[in-house]
Amino acid sequence: MDADQEKDLQKFLKNVDEITNLIQEMNSDDPVVQQNAVLETEKRLLLMEEDQEEDECRTTLNKTVISPPQTAVKSAEEVNSEAFLASVEKDAKERAKRRRENKVLADALKDKGNEAFAEGNYETAILHYSEGLEKLKDVKVLYTNRAQAYMKLKNYEKALVDCEWALKCDEKCTKAYFHMGRANLALKNYSVSRECYKKILEINPKLQTQVKDYLNQVDLQEKADLQEKEAHELLDSGKNTAVNTKNLLETLSKPDQIPLFYAGGIEILTEMIKECTEQTLFRMHDGFSIISDNEVVRRCFSTAGKDAIEETVCVSVLKLWQAVCCGNEENQRVLVMHPDRARLLATLLSSKVLAIRQQSLALLLQLAQTESGRSLIISHLDLTRLLEALVSFLDFSDKEANTAMGLFTDLALEERFQVWFQANLPGVLPAVTSVLKTDPKVSSSSALCQCIAIMGNLSAEPATRGHMAACEEFGDGCLSLLARCEENVALFREVIYTLLGLMMNLCLQAPFVSEVWAVEVSRRCLSLLNSQDGGILTRAAGVLSRTLSSSLKIVEEALQAGVVKKKKKKKKKKKKK
C-alpha cells in the first residue's frame, strides 16, 4: 500500500470514528448533547456537499508523458466511505423531518398544558408538558412550565430539577432562574434563592426592578422565619405574654358568641400586642383568620346600618390589625394578600360610620409607610374604589382630609401606581374630576392643594395629559374652580397657584378641549395679571403663553389690555442733501 492509499485509509477510519461518535450522541438521553450532535452532523454534511461540488467543477490537465493514466475505478475504501456518509445523510434528513413533526406535536401539547394550568388543573398540565417532552426533549419552555405547575403543587424538588434541564437547553433562561429562586425560597434556602435572582440581573440588567422585588421577598421571608424561631423559644420558655397571647387567641376562636364577647377579647388582645414576639405569635397561631373568618365579626362588618355594638366590634378589629402590623412587614403581607381582607379594607374606607372610616384610613396610612406596604396596597386593593374613597375625605375635617391626601401622595409617587393610573384613567377620571367641583370655602385648602398637585404631577405624562385634556368636564372643572377661587384671591392663593400649574400642563396638549375653553382660560389669566403675587403672576403668564395663539379674538383683547404690545414701525431718517 503506497503512501496516498495509507493516507486515504487513515482519513476513512477517522471519519468512521467521528461518525460513530455522532450517532451515539444523537441517541443520548441528554437533549443538549443530542442537539449538538445533530448540528455537528448537519455541518459535516454541508462540508461534504461543498467538497463534492468542487470535485465536479475541477478539471485535471496533465501533459507530461511520464504521468500514469488515471483510473476511473474507485477504491473499495472510497466506495465504503461514500456509502456510509450517504447513509448518515439520509438518517440526518429523516431525523430532521421527525424533529419538525415532533415540534408541532410538542407545541400542541404545551398549549394543552397551558389551558389546564389556567384552569387550575396542575396535575393535568404536568401530564401534557411531560408528553410534550417525550416528543422533543430540548424544549426549555416545557421544562419551565412544568416547573411552575410543580410549584403550584408545592413539589419544589421536582421544580428545581426541571429548571436545571431548562438551563441545559439555554444557559441564559431567566424564567428558569426565577422559578429556581421561588422554589429555593419555599425550601428556605435563602442564600441560594438570592443567587438565582442575581443571576437574572446578570443576564438581563433591564429586569432590575423585578429582581429588586424578588430579593426583597427573600429578605422579608428570612426575617419572618427568624421571628418565628424566636417566638417559639419564648413560648417554650413559658414567658407570660407569649402564653397569654396564644391562650387568648384560642378563646376568641370559640364560635357563635355574642358580639361584645369578641369586642372585649379583641381589645384585651390589642393591649397585649406590645412587641414583635406577640405580633409573630398572633400570625403563627392563625390570628388573622380567627378574627376575619369569625361569622359574628363578618356580620358586623357586612351590616350597612351598624348599631353601637357592631361599630365597636369593627373598630376593635381595625385597631388590632394596626397593632399587629405596626413595623411588621410579614404581618402586613398576610393581612393584605388575603382577597377577602383586601376587599374589606377598600370597602371600609367608604363606610358611613365615621369611626370606621378613620380607623381604616389610619391602618392604610400605616401600611403605606414602607415600600413593601405601598406595593401591597397597589397590588392587592381595588385602587379605583380606594381613590374614590380618598378624594371623598376632602369634605371632612382638615386633619382627616390632609391624612387622606398624604396617603394619596405616597401612593401616587410609586411608579406602579402611575402605570395603573394611566391604564385605568377612563374609569378613574370621574373621581378625579369631582375634586375640581369642591367648594374651596368648605374644604380644607391644604388638602385640596395637595390633591390638585398630585393631578398636576400625573398630568406630566403625555398619555395621561391627553385623556385629561380631551375630557370636557375636566377642563370645565378647572375653570369653575378657578372662578370660585378668584372671589378671594388672598384666601385661596395656594389653590389658585397649584391649579394654574395643572392648567399649564393641560395647555401643552394640542388641540385644546375647545377654542371656547381656551378663550375663557385666557380671560381668567388676563385678570390674574393684576395680582400682586409673583407666583400667580408668573403662572398666569405661563398659561397665557400657551393659549393666546388659539384665538385671534383673545389676542385682540390682550392688545387692548396692554398685555401684548404691537411693534412700532421705525421711521426712516431722511438723508440730508
Swiss-Prot record:
<keyword id="KW-0677">Repeat</keyword>
<feature type="repeat" description="TPR 1">
    <location>
        <begin position="106"/>
        <end position="139"/>
    </location>
</feature>
<dbReference type="InterPro" id="IPR011990">
    <property type="entry name" value="TPR-like_helical_dom_sf"/>
</dbReference>
<feature type="repeat" description="TPR 2">
    <location>
        <begin position="140"/>
        <end position="173"/>
    </location>
</feature>
<keyword id="KW-0597">Phosphoprotein</keyword>
<keyword id="KW-0963">Cytoplasm</keyword>
<dbReference type="InterPro" id="IPR043195">
    <property type="entry name" value="TTC12"/>
</dbReference>
<feature type="modified residue" description="Phosphothreonine">
    <location>
        <position position="71"/>
    </location>
</feature>
<dbReference type="Pfam" id="PF13181">
    <property type="entry name" value="TPR_8"/>
</dbReference>
<keyword id="KW-0970">Cilium biogenesis/degradation</keyword>
<dbReference type="GO" id="GO:0005737">
    <property type="term" value="C:cytoplasm"/>
</dbReference>
<dbReference type="GO" id="GO:0007288">
    <property type="term" value="P:sperm axoneme assembly"/>
</dbReference>
<dbReference type="InterPro" id="IPR011989">
    <property type="entry name" value="ARM-like"/>
</dbReference>
<dbReference type="GO" id="GO:0070286">
    <property type="term" value="P:axonemal dynein complex assembly"/>
</dbReference>
<protein>
    <recommendedName>
        <fullName>Tetratricopeptide repeat protein 12</fullName>
    </recommendedName>
</protein>
<comment type="function">
    <text>Cytoplasmic protein that plays a role in the proper assembly of dynein arm complexes in motile cilia in both respiratory cells and sperm flagella.</text>
</comment>
<dbReference type="Pfam" id="PF00515">
    <property type="entry name" value="TPR_1"/>
</dbReference>
<feature type="repeat" description="TPR 3">
    <location>
        <begin position="174"/>
        <end position="207"/>
    </location>
</feature>
<dbReference type="InterPro" id="IPR019734">
    <property type="entry name" value="TPR_rpt"/>
</dbReference>
<dbReference type="GO" id="GO:0005813">
    <property type="term" value="C:centrosome"/>
</dbReference>
<dbReference type="InterPro" id="IPR016024">
    <property type="entry name" value="ARM-type_fold"/>
</dbReference>
<keyword id="KW-0802">TPR repeat</keyword>
